UniProtKB/Swiss-Prot annotation:
Lineage of the species this protein comes from: Bacteria, Bacillati, Cyanobacteriota, Cyanophyceae, Synechococcales
Gene: acpP
Organism: Synechococcus sp. (strain RCC307)
Ranges of residues in domain Carrier: 3-78
Locations listed in the record: Cytoplasm
Primary location: cytoplasm
Annotated protein name in UniProt: Acyl carrier protein
GO terms classed as biological process: lipid A biosynthetic process
Amino acid sequence: MSQEILEKVRSIVAEQLSVDAAEVKPESNFQNDLGADSLDTVELVMALEEAFDIEIPDEAAEGIATVGDAVSYIQEKKG
């Protein structure tokens, strides 16, 4: 897992969900651990798309449940 991508995702998640970045770990589930609702999740995906200049299709977004999932997906897209 790329530390650089993880740190950027951690920062974005903390800002979007108004949580302490220290709480944002690779295994953190957006809904169960970080309190995101469905609207938060959509906004988070949009923020990640913008920050990393990628497109995350709805079907892919549905499979991203944790911070680690997001990092892995972004790593894969960025090659």
